[in-house]
Amino acid sequence: MPLTHLNEENQPKMVDIGDKETTERIALASGRISMNKEAYDAIINHGVKKGPVLQTAIIAGIMAAKKTSELIPMCHPIMLNGVDIDILEEKETCSFKLYARVKTQAKTGVEMEALMSVSIGLLTIYDMVKVIDKSMTISGVMLEHKSGGKSGDYNAKK
């Protein structure tokens, strides 16, 4: 399959989506941040001096989805219909799993917006808690699902 972001001279270009059909597009991405028990408990018990960590991560994730095209060079700026973020507490592993669902009616998908949302949400958690645990790890950032568009639906293998 040829790369669509290169022109005839092998130089970068933004793909022309003008002739594509506007359809509903949805993307769901996820990722995890793991930390020590002290950091996990501080988040759960609202004991982080910088403020409410999980709520701040949700806001950061929403903001990131809206700014994706400003940071990813070939990503088209698109109007988002909604960004919904859910953070699951995983007490046994002292980790949090963040899910971002992004929805639009557009000529291109929102996979990058969902992935950006997850990444920035997790980085925000890291930033707010690094004073307690600098060894936190972010892992498994991935596209779980996408629907709409010419390529159809995608579901990650479990």
UniProtKB/Swiss-Prot annotation:
GO MF terms, alphabetically ordered: cyclic pyranopterin monophosphate synthase activity
Keyword Thylakoid appears in the UniProt entry: no
Keyword 4Fe-4S on entry: no
Residues annotated as signal peptide: none
Lineage: superkingdom: Bacteria
Keywords: Lyase, Molybdenum cofactor biosynthesis
GO biological process: Mo-molybdopterin cofactor biosynthetic process
Enzyme class: lyase
Active site (record annotation): 127
EC number: 4.6.1.17
Pathway noted in the entry: Cofactor biosynthesis; molybdopterin biosynthesis
Pfam families per record: MoaC (PF01967)
Binding positions (substrate): 74-76, 112-113
Reactions that this protein is recorded to catalyse: (8S)-3',8-cyclo-7,8-dihydroguanosine 5'-triphosphate = cyclic pyranopterin phosphate + diphosphate
Record text on subunit structure and interactions: Homohexamer; trimer of dimers.
Family, per entry: Belongs to the MoaC family.
Function: Catalyzes the conversion of (8S)-3',8-cyclo-7,8-dihydroguanosine 5'-triphosphate to cyclic pyranopterin monophosphate (cPMP).
Annotated protein name in UniProt: Cyclic pyranopterin monophosphate synthase
Protein's organism: Helicobacter pylori (strain J99 / ATCC 700824) (Campylobacter pylori J99)
